[in-house]
């Protein structure tokens, strides 16, 4: 054990650790790029597993030095080339590295979103770990042969490997986060891997490329990229000092909507700033929902937000005055629909409650006929934006919705259109609009009104909807699936959710329970 006190041994250990780290940088870069393909919860485990297997592999190779030496002995010749086992391993590793780096570059340059879970379905944990281990084997062979040529003591070589791998484990997570958060650095690292792969292939054919040339090229590229990252940092600091990220994001969206392209560079800069902003939200959830609703406003028709004629509170034109007064006492609306008789389908117009009150205050008998006003008439296929414009031009807030035969299907108000953007706006005496009634239950399910519009439902429950559908409510969805009126207790599976009919009155679906399902199709809880 006298060698422990030998300064040359310690110098060799330190030198060997440095060399192991230098030779392991390319391995770390490859691990960083591969680990990013996995779901976030598996990335750390993949990195640690890959590096620990690399350490185990290098220790096993060091323990079998006598076998390792035989790898450099010639196996066969082909024309002017002589190949050993080490040369074949270098060739395989070089071609594998060239293939993987080329595929990764193609994915990045073709614009595939590596953060999109739908494009990352093929990334399996052990598949990624296997690729890491294959590259570890190739890089381990190179580093172990270097160690054998520098130090004579096996324990020193093993200690250097353990220390180097431990340092790489500590640096792997921040390196992975840094590399994958800067797209230009990812491209640069993949270019390095191409260079290293090419050098391995050349070395396998017996053409020795001095490592100094490779490291000089890599070092120069890193220096240029460092200057580039510094310039980007200064530019972002300048932009942030003049405008908040929220303002810049808003301007970028508005330029995109207006079709302006002259500030594309600034928009790209804003997008990069958003990526670097992490998980912190620039806009709160209410603002994001409102923006989404505004952008989808012209995709919805008045029939999707109207109040069905069956839910309209109406008054008979010939009703006695006492009945009118009783209706006014319990009424919660500012307008009443006037019908000719008790038939809710024969709508004559609307009267304003305030007009009736003024008539009563003047001591006049209540006369509905002279107070009737004609509302707007919308076809049921009218989009909401033109409807909003008609409300503005006509200076009225009320409209009848009719089908192609002229039959009144329901009513729609300016408040209905406003709620499509801002969400439900209940008045002082109204807890919540029944058409938008949805509550989340303690067991994780939802209870919704059957007449709730599907466009509002998907804000809470992400049901898959057919863009060409001819129905607009939950009840319509159930009837489309069953091809008849549902019965209480009947269930329909839509995507990952089970829709259970709870209440049906007069052939109308009143309440529906929406139950989330597990991926295997079973309920997440007992109903």
Curated annotation (Swiss-Prot):
<dbReference type="Pfam" id="PF00571">
    <property type="entry name" value="CBS"/>
</dbReference>
<dbReference type="GO" id="GO:0050660">
    <property type="term" value="F:flavin adenine dinucleotide binding"/>
</dbReference>
<dbReference type="Pfam" id="PF03741">
    <property type="entry name" value="TerC"/>
</dbReference>
<feature type="transmembrane region" description="Helical">
    <location>
        <begin position="81"/>
        <end position="101"/>
    </location>
</feature>
<comment type="similarity">
    <text>Belongs to the UPF0053 family.</text>
</comment>
<dbReference type="Pfam" id="PF03471">
    <property type="entry name" value="CorC_HlyC"/>
</dbReference>
<dbReference type="InterPro" id="IPR044751">
    <property type="entry name" value="Ion_transp-like_CBS"/>
</dbReference>
<feature type="domain" description="CBS 2">
    <location>
        <begin position="371"/>
        <end position="429"/>
    </location>
</feature>
<keyword id="KW-0812">Transmembrane</keyword>
<dbReference type="InterPro" id="IPR005170">
    <property type="entry name" value="Transptr-assoc_dom"/>
</dbReference>
<feature type="domain" description="CBS 1">
    <location>
        <begin position="306"/>
        <end position="366"/>
    </location>
</feature>
<keyword id="KW-1133">Transmembrane helix</keyword>
<keyword id="KW-0677">Repeat</keyword>
<dbReference type="GO" id="GO:0005886">
    <property type="term" value="C:plasma membrane"/>
</dbReference>
<dbReference type="InterPro" id="IPR005496">
    <property type="entry name" value="Integral_membrane_TerC"/>
</dbReference>
<feature type="transmembrane region" description="Helical">
    <location>
        <begin position="14"/>
        <end position="34"/>
    </location>
</feature>
<keyword id="KW-1003">Cell membrane</keyword>
<dbReference type="InterPro" id="IPR000644">
    <property type="entry name" value="CBS_dom"/>
</dbReference>
<dbReference type="InterPro" id="IPR036318">
    <property type="entry name" value="FAD-bd_PCMH-like_sf"/>
</dbReference>
<protein>
    <recommendedName>
        <fullName>UPF0053 protein YegH</fullName>
    </recommendedName>
</protein>
<feature type="transmembrane region" description="Helical">
    <location>
        <begin position="145"/>
        <end position="165"/>
    </location>
</feature>
<dbReference type="InterPro" id="IPR046342">
    <property type="entry name" value="CBS_dom_sf"/>
</dbReference>
<dbReference type="InterPro" id="IPR016169">
    <property type="entry name" value="FAD-bd_PCMH_sub2"/>
</dbReference>
<keyword id="KW-0472">Membrane</keyword>
<keyword id="KW-0129">CBS domain</keyword>
<feature type="transmembrane region" description="Helical">
    <location>
        <begin position="185"/>
        <end position="205"/>
    </location>
</feature>
<feature type="transmembrane region" description="Helical">
    <location>
        <begin position="51"/>
        <end position="71"/>
    </location>
</feature>
């Amino acid at each position: 054990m006298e060698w422990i006190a030998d300064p040359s041994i310690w110098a060799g250990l330190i030198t060997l650790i440095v060399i192991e780290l230098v030779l392991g940088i390319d391995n770390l870069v490859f691990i960083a790029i591969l680990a990013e393909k996995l779901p976030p919860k598996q990335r750390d485990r993949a990195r640690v597993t890959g590096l620990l297997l690399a350490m185990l592999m290098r220790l096993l190779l060091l323990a079998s030095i006598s076998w390792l030496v035989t790898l450099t002995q010639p196996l066969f010749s082909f024309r002017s080339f002589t190949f050993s086992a080490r040369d074949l391993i270098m060739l395989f590793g070089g071609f594998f590295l060239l293939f993987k780096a080329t595929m990764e570059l193609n994915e990045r340059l073709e614009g595939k979103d590596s953060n999109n879970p739908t494009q990352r379905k093929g990334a399996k944990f052990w598949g990624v770990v296997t690729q890491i281990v294959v590259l570890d084997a190739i890089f381990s062979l190179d580093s172990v042969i270097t160690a054998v040529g520098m130090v004579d003591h096996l324990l020193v070589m093993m200690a250097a490997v353990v220390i180097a791998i431990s340092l790489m484990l500590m640096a792997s997570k921040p390196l992975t986060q840094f590399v994958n958060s800067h797209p230009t650095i990812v491209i640069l690292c993949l270019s390095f891997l191409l260079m290293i792969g090419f050098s391995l292939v050349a070395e396998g054919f017996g053409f020795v490329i001095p490592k100094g040339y490779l490291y000089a090229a890599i070092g120069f590229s890193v220096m240029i990229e460092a200057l580039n990252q510094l310039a980007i940092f200064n530019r972002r600091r300048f932009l942030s000092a003049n405008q908040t990220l929220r303002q810049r994001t808003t301007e970028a969206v508005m330029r995109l909507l207006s079709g302006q392209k002259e500030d594309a560079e600034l928009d790209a800069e804003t997008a990069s700033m958003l990526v670097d902003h992490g998980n912190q939200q620039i806009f709160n959830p209410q603002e994001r929902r409102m923006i989404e609703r505004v952008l989808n406003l012209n995709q919805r028709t008045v029939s999707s937000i109207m109040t069905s004629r069956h839910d309209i509170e109406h008054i008979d034109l010939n009703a006695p005055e006492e009945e009118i007064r009783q209706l006014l006492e319990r009424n919660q609306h500012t307008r009443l629909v006037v019908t000719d008789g008790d038939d809710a389908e024969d709508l004559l117009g609307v009267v304003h409650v305030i007009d009736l009150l003024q008539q009563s205050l003047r001591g006049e008998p209540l006369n509905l006929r002279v107070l009737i006003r004609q509302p707007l008439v919308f076809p049921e296929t009218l989009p909401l934006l033109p409807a909003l414009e008609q409300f503005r031009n006509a200076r009225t807030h009320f409209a009848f919705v009719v089908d192609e035969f002229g039959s009144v299907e329901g009513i729609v108000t300016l408040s209905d259109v406003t709620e499509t953007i801002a969400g439900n706006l209940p008045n002082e005496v109204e807890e919540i609009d029944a058409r938008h009634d949805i509550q989340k239950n303690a067991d994780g399910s939802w209870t919704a009104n059957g007449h709730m519009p599907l466009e509002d439902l998907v804000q809470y429950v992400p049901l898959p909807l057919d863009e060409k559908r001819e129905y607009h409510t939950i009840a319509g969805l159930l009837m489309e699936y069953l091809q008849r009126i549902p019965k209480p207790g009947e269930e329909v599976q839509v995507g990952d959710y089970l829709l259970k009919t709870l209440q049906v009155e007069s052939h109308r679906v009143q309440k529906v329970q929406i139950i989330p399902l597990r991926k295997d199709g079973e309920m997440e809880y007992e109903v």
